[in-house]
Amino acid sequence: MYDIKAWQHVFKLDPAKEISDNDLDALCMSDTDAIMIGGTDNVTEDNVIHLMSRVRRYPLPLVLEISNIESIIPGFDFYFVPTVLNSQDTTYHNGMMHKALKQFGFMVNFDEVVLEGYLVLNPDSKVAKLTQSNTNIDIEDVEAYAQMVNEMYKLPLMYLEYSGQYGDVEKVEAASRLLTNTQLFYGGGITSIEQAREMAQYADTIVVGNIIYDDIKKAIKTVKIKKESNK
């Protein structure tokens, strides 16, 4: 079993987007710690299977971040399940999870399931609109959510999701100060090694996504934070 705690860098691939074999090879051979597959819309069983089969050729941990029940398939090392803490719709707190367990709970290997305390922070993102997330939150709110995740829910991961927008470093730092046991993931808008380096000061794990499809060379450069890290 892979040790998620050791991950510093993850590439996130959207199954609804095209990526060439050459670019995929470059990502998977880049020394990233893991590949995550996930997206907000147009995520289907077919495109998840297709992308998974291409990534499986490489000796890397492979994660499915679940966005709908229909696209859950066997064959991943881990299944990350977001519970969106600032969603105003209980579907995205535990409603989808409840529905999935009613159907498939008897066959779930819970050693592969990782619950993420998720904060959606980009008001213009598709995921914010889909989940009806209250993104108008300040540092004190982030600190309260971090305490909730770390001290009360005792979740293994907290994920600050800016979804295409580069985030507020002070909020990431605030969360990191209070997460003594929970691992902090940051994702959103990282387009350069400088931004990756800045967020990696506070997040245990950075997730790099959109830049893969805009500039593969810049995406690959973000992996350098692993060699620079003193963690």
Curated annotation (Swiss-Prot):
Its cofactor is Mg(2+). The keyword Lipid metabolism applies. Mg(2+) binds at residues 14, 40. Sn-glycerol 1-phosphate binds at residues 12, 159-164, 189, 209-210. Its EC number is 2.5.1.n9. Pfam families: PcrB. InterPro entries: GGGP/HepGP_synthase_I, GGGP/HepGP_synthase_sf, GGGP_HepGP_synthase. CDD domains: PcrB_like. GO terms for biological process: glycerophospholipid biosynthetic process. Keywords: Lipid biosynthesis, Lipid metabolism, Magnesium, Metal-binding, Phospholipid biosynthesis, Phospholipid metabolism, Transferase. It is an enzyme of class 2 (transferase). It catalyses: sn-glycerol 1-phosphate + all-trans-heptaprenyl diphosphate = 3-heptaprenyl-sn-glycero-1-phosphate + diphosphate. The keyword Transmembrane does not apply. Pathway: Membrane lipid metabolism; glycerophospholipid metabolism. One of its GO terms (molecular function) is magnesium ion binding. PANTHER family: HEPTAPRENYLGLYCERYL PHOSPHATE SYNTHASE (PTHR40029:SF2), PTHR40029. Homodimer. Prenyltransferase that catalyzes in vivo the transfer of the heptaprenyl moiety of heptaprenyl pyrophosphate (HepPP; 35 carbon atoms) to the C3 hydroxyl of sn-glycerol-1-phosphate (G1P), producing heptaprenylglyceryl phosphate (HepGP). This reaction is an ether-bond-formation step in the biosynthesis of archaea-type G1P-based membrane lipids found in Bacillales. Belongs to the GGGP/HepGP synthase family. Group I subfamily. This is Heptaprenylglyceryl phosphate synthase.
